[in-house]
Amino acid sequence: MKITEDIIYAGVNDHQVDLFEGQYRVPNGMAYNSYVILDEKTAVMDTVDANFADEWLANVAKALDGRKPDYLIVQHMEPDHSANIENFVKAYPEATVVANTKTFAMMKNFFPKMDLAGRKLEVKDGESLTLGKHVLTFVFAPMVHWPEVMVTYDSTDKVLFAADGFGKFGALDREEPWDDEARRYFIGIVGKYGPQVQKLLKVAGTLDIQKICSLHGPVLTENLGHYIEKYDIWSSYRPEEEGVVVAYTSVYGNTKKAAELLADKLKEKGCPKVVVYDLARDDMSAAVADAFRYSKLVLATLTYNAGIYPFMQDFINRLTERSFQNRTIGLIENGSWAPTAAKVMKGMFDKSKNITWTENNVKVMSAVKEENVKEIEALAEELCK
């Protein structure tokens, strides 16, 4: 697949993986992207996952069409992109590996027996590499989302090779809208590092970018402003749109009843969007992504071992470790003798910024009663304002 006249896609699709990074469900698989740039000198951009060594090397050879690669440019050392560096070096003993200081240090840890003597080109932030008419400029992007990450700008074809930036879940041979799986990918994997993404976006804003080539997901070629705007929203932790996420855990169905009753009341009152998640059964990463997508969140759980139910604890931890902020939160707690869930949940957000707590909350003692229905009505009224 040609990206431009001189840039050819050499990546692979993975339909073997069921959990990316051992935790994110990927029903449509994953893409591990790699690119070949043809010029007076040739460059390969990154490698792919270890399970696809032969397929990737064949793709690279096909793209090179009989030529030898001059450079392997390593932007990111996470194994889904770096696993085949040693295989490449063995296959092409005359090629030079291009990376930064931190990348080479990591490379030594991943491949302790690999000998790169005389085959290393160490680059600094802002330095360029000329292939011929193509000039590649390296922009360091530390903690987006590893410390060694850099992106590469081709000023000739105006292409940004964005490392994991602008990536998404899903293989390239499965068509699906970009936003949802890119949001889930960003919030889950990169979301903790919003300030670092903001810095990279500022640099990107100074470049004339016509295509974005990520290491995951499709090449972005049209309406780039849409994708950049989404990244700006996600990395600044602002709500994308108005709506309410109701996230609950329930043992015997009573807390579930309260959560579902609230959702029904919200819909009756014309709330623009209402999404309900059973945290024990639904995809946790989707629940987290939607909590960042919408402006308001309701947490409904029971007191459990003098704390809160484990799935709710996990959910809140995932939010707070990703700098959840700028949201309104309401609480529904349940308990049979000494409810503490609301206090515990609220305390977990002590370090979160710009959290507005609803005035109306719901306290259930074992089962939903008439007074709880009134509390739920009041909470729905407040959330729909």
What are these regions (language model features)?
Residues 45-47, 69-77, 97-100, 160-164, ...:
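Active-site neighborhood of phospho(di)ester-bond hydrolases with catalytic His/Asp-centered motifs
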Residues 40, 51-98:
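Active-site metal-binding motif and surrounding structural segment of the metallo-beta-lactamase
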Residues 145, 149, 165-192, 235-240:
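Active-site-proximal loop/helix segment associated with metal-binding centers of metalloenzymes
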Residues 247-269:
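Short, charged N-terminal beta->alpha structural module
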Residues 172-212, 216-219, 261-277, 287-385:
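FMN-binding flavodoxin-like domain, especially the glycine-rich phosphate-binding loop
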Residues 213-240:
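Short N-terminal or domain-adjacent regulatory/targeting segments
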Residues 2-5, 99-149, 193-199:
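Metallo-beta-lactamase
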Residues 2-62, 151-154, 158-162, 255:
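Conserved beta-strand hairpin/beta-sheet module of binuclear metal-dependent hydrolase folds
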